[in-house]
């Protein structure tokens, strides 16, 4: 299999602390599930001893997309729904970086849904963490693509009438090569699947249920053991390479299953493009872009 994944080399420093990654104080509402995801991210980087200059956090627009401001590392707060194309460019041009994309259910499945699907089918090497709260919180309680039927909001004062999407079904259909699901209130499990996603050579995506305590409190109590819910792990015998089996798990009624639904290996966009560049350079005797352009002009002169 073609691969172009470069190993991440630690610099000469002996120890990296999560304190070095902390930037501005998070401005989320008290109790927001996004705090937990940020904490997991810091712990994961400290555990892996990855220098902050070797990671990048990119986001679109939304409560979750404030993420890059709170991380002392490369990052970008991009246009609504357009973070994935930017992250794709970073991934293709900087293979030495761990590229993380953060977004909410609106950024991922509404305005940015087309970009998510294409990055997934191309198998771009990056990790997308979807912080799903079932509501547009930044715009003060509007119905999102994952809001359940009957949900009352400023855009649906009598209750949502549109069928919500099933994130797992959509992600499996998109062609993503690593798909997982977790809950921000169970940080140990969330960190476990995020680490697996980070290690995956390809497009990895995780839906993390992240409660909006301001505009949709209790949305995920059914999956929270502390609130009397059931956190149903995917059975150990599940074959993560079986797409049909993954679909069957995705069909479960809410709150559904948690863990790795699907995980396969296939050539990444990064590796295929790098191989194409190598072939082109070999065919053109390593001519520079300017020389190739001049050769093109010469053919028409």
Residue ranges and their predicted role:
Residues 61-137:
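Thiamine diphosphate
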Residues 61-63, 133-135, 186, 209-215, ...:
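Glycine-rich beta-alpha junction loops
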Residues 8, 13-79:
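Active-site diphosphate/adenylate-binding microenvironment
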Residues 1-14, 23-24, 212-301:
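Flexible, low-complexity linker and terminal segments
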Residues 24, 51-55, 74, 93-99, ...:
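Short coil/turn connectors at secondary-structure junctions
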Residues 142-151, 187, 194-203, 217-231, ...:
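Short, surface-exposed, charged loop/turn segments at secondary-structure junctions
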Residues 96, 144-197:
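Conserved thiamine diphosphate
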């Amino acid at each position: 299999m073609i691969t172009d994944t470069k190993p991440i080399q630690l610099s000469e420093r002996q120890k990296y602390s999560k304190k070095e990654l902390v930037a501005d104080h998070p401005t989320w509402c008290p109790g927001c599930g996004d705090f937990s995801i940020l904490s997991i991210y810091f712990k994961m980087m400290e555990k892996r001893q990855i220098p902050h200059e070797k990671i990048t956090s990119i986001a679109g627009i939304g409560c979750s997309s404030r993420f890059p401001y709170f991380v002392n590392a490369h990052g970008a707060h991009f246009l609504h729904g357009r973070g994935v194309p930017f992250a794709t460019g970073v991934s293709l041009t900087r293979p030495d970086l761990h590229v993380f994309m953060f977004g909410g259910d609106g950024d991922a499945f509404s305005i940015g849904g087309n970009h998510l699907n294409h990055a997934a089918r191309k198998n771009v090497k990056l990790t997308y963490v979807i912080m799903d709260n079932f509501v547009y919180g930044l715009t003060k309680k509007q119905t999102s693509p994952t809001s359940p039927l009957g949900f009352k909001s400023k855009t649906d004062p009598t209750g949502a009438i549109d069928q919500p999407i099933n994130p797992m079904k959509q992600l499996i259909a998109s062609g993503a090569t690593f798909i997982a699901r977790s809950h921000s209130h169970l940080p140990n499990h969330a960190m476990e699947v995020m680490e697996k996603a980070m290690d995956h050579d390809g497009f990895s995506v995780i839906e993390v249920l992240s409660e909006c305590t301001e505009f949709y409190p209790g949305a995920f109590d059914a999956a929270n053991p502390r609130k009397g819910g059931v956190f149903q792990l995917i059975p150990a015998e599940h074959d993560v390479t079986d797409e049909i089996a993954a679909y069957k798990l995705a069909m479960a009624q809410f709150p559904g299953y948690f863990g790795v639904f699907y995980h396969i290996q296939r050539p990444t966009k990064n590796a295929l493009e790098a191989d194409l560049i190598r072939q082109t350079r070999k065919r053109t005797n390593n001519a520079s872009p300017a020389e190739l352009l001049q050769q093109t002009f010469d053919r028409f002169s």
